[in-house]
């Protein structure tokens, strides 16, 4: 944001979240794959650099600091949780060189960057000491109502009346205080010590600054948010589920607007940071999680779960695939019901089929493992066929060992490859073999007992059994 005034953002993130009934800090509970606080920081960081964002932390402060360290934001600790006004008081030294501060809530995760920008622009335009972000939700019960001057026809705020103090006439006003504000730093801290704890909870409420600043002849104004969902906070598990569903559906709508087909989007779980290319089809009950990136022209069938993985263009994922922290190149075919564990790297046009599990395995272009196979710590070349029931034995109880399979190798069904081992290019492995030694290029390896046929044996056996009866 371009402005001549130096502008900071403070995020209230010290609360315990008692109604969540959790041992975890409130702001670290997740929706759409990220902590609540992470969503707020993401919106704020598009307005000011992280060095100008101050998270006020308290309950489980060390855990919150550790979880958000990579964001580059600053932290201010509120050692005693004595209310929102007391929280802002802790930032006095941190904000001494700033002209304005915008106060966000770490448990209000749907706030949008453009709303933050609108709020500050409105605040600056009106030269206000305090600007309140308001909204008109379908059901305003429980929220403090904002009353404007001149019978509601003014930007200036007359007063805020809490739910318990509302008269029946006042209760008809649906404009609520969102708890998100912009302040001029100088009048804020000049008057902050006027806050009292004269309320049922014995806390210092930042909301009371509207009356205090107004009484000091400072200008207090309000601006409405476009969407009431933006300012909804999380207090209960029900709130968490509701906002998660809203954010995920919003994500689906964004993807569909960008050319992605999503059938029954309300059944899909797509995290905030997921990217999907155009003309990809996503069937019901698909989960795309974490930092997943899906290419164009893919088809992802129902009950597939992809997390922190990269999928190339034109990949078909049949029903029930699980892909975790892996890469899949263009035009590969997966499933149904395959499991790619971390560090799997599936090449172009490769096939990983029914009940095949891979881990730390690279599969070359056009290679196929279509049925009932485990491939762990394995390097597979191009044009390889892995028969049904093949197992790489990569673990001796202490250490893991690798298997190398060269280009154009044919591995027969029900084969056991005991690592460390290497199969040379173009070699053949007979079905049912247990291979314990390296196989040269273009060789045939058979590691099984020789078949013995005894003609007439079954007839004699049945005759003997009959005599014993």
UniProtKB/Swiss-Prot annotation:
Region (Linker), start-end ranges: 238-258
Cofactor section: Mg(2+)
Protein's pathway: Nucleotide-sugar biosynthesis; UDP-N-acetyl-alpha-D-glucosamine biosynthesis; N-acetyl-alpha-D-glucosamine 1-phosphate from alpha-D-glucosamine 6-phosphate (route II): step 2/2; Nucleotide-sugar biosynthesis; UDP-N-acetyl-alpha-D-glucosamine biosynthesis; UDP-N-acetyl-alpha-D-glucosamine from N-acetyl-alpha-D-glucosamine 1-phosphate: step 1/1; Bacterial outer membrane biogenesis; LPS lipid A biosynthesis
Cofactor binding, note field: Binds 1 Mg(2+) ion per subunit.
UniProt-annotated binding residues for acetyl-CoA: 388, 394-395, 413, 431, 448
Catalytic activity: alpha-D-glucosamine 1-phosphate + acetyl-CoA = N-acetyl-alpha-D-glucosamine 1-phosphate + CoA + H(+); N-acetyl-alpha-D-glucosamine 1-phosphate + UTP + H(+) = UDP-N-acetyl-alpha-D-glucosamine + diphosphate
One Gene Ontology term, aspect cellular component: membrane
Residue segments, region Pyrophosphorylase: 1-237
Leading EC class: transferase
Annotated EC: 2.7.7.23, 2.3.1.157
Localization: Cytoplasm
GO biological process: cell morphogenesis; cell wall organization; lipid A biosynthetic process; peptidoglycan biosynthetic process; regulation of cell shape; UDP-N-acetylglucosamine biosynthetic process
Annotated segments matching region N-acetyltransferase: 259-469
Keyword field: Acyltransferase, Cell shape, Cell wall biogenesis/degradation, Cytoplasm, Magnesium, Metal-binding, Multifunctional enzyme, Nucleotidyltransferase, Peptidoglycan synthesis, Repeat, Transferase
Description of how the protein assembles with itself and partners: Homotrimer.
PANTHER family, alphabetized: BIFUNCTIONAL PROTEIN GLMU (PTHR43584:SF3), NUCLEOTIDYL TRANSFERASE (PTHR43584)
Stated name of the protein: Bifunctional protein GlmU
Gene name for this UniProt entry: glmU
């Amino acid at each position: 944001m371009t402005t001549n005034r130096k502008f900071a953002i403070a995020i209230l993130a010290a609360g315990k979240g008692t109604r969540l009934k959790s041992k975890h800090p409130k702001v670290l509970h997740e929706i759409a794959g990220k902590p609540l606080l992470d969503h707020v920081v993401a919106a704020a960081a598009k307005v000011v650099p992280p060095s100008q964002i101050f998270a006020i932390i308290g309950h489980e402060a060390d855990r919150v600091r550790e979880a958000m360290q990579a964001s580059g934001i600053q932290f201010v600790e509120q050692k005693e949780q004595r209310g929102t006004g007391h929280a802002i008081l802790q930032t006095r030294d941190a904000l001494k060189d700033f002209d304005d501060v915008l106060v966000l809530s770490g448990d209000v995760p749907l706030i949008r960057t453009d709303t933050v920008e609108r709020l500050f622009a409105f605040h600056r335009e009106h030269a206000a000491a305090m600007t309140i972000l308001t909204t008109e939700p379908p059901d305003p019960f429980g929220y403090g109502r904002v009353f404007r001057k001149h019978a509601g026809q003014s930007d200036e705020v007359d007063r805020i009346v809490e739910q318990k103090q509302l008269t029946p006439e006042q209760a008809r006003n649906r404009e609520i205080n969102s708890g998100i504000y912009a302040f001029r730093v100088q009048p804020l801290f000049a008057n902050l010590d006027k806050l009292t704890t004269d309320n049922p909870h014995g806390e210092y409420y930042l909301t009371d600054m509207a009356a205090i600043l107004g009484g000091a002849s400072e200008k207090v104004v309000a601006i409405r948010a476009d969407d009431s969902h933006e300012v909804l906070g999380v207090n209960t598990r029900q709130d968490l589920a509701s906002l998660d569903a809203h954010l995920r559906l919003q994500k689906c709508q964004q993807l569909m607007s960008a050319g992605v087909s999503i059938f029954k989007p309300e059944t899909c779980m797509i995290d905030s940071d997921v990217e999907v290319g155009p003309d990809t089809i996503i069937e019901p009950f698909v989960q795309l999680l974490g930092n997943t990136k899906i290419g164009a022209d893919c088809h992802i069938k129902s009950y597939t779960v992809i997390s922190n993985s990269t999928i190339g263009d034109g990949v078909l994922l049949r029903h029930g695939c699980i892909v975790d922290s892996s890469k899949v190149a263009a035009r590969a075919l997966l499933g149904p019901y395959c499991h790619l564990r971390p560090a799997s790297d599936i090449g172009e046009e490769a096939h990983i089929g029914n009940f095949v599990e891979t881990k730390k395995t690279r599969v070359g272009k056009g290679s196929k493992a279509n049925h009932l196979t485990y491939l762990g710590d394995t390097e597979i070349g191009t044009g390889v066929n892995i028969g049904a029931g093949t197992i790489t034995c990569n673990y001796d109880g202490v250490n893991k060992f690798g298997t190398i399979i060269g280009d154009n190798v044919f591995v027969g069904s029900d084969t056991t490859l005991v690592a460390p081992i290497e199969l040379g290019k173009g070699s053949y492995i007979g079905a049912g073999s247990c291979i314990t030694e390296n196989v040269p290029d273009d060789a045939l390896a058979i590691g099984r007992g020789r078949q013995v046929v005894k003609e007439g044996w079954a007839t004699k056996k049945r005759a003997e059994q009959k005599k014993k009866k």
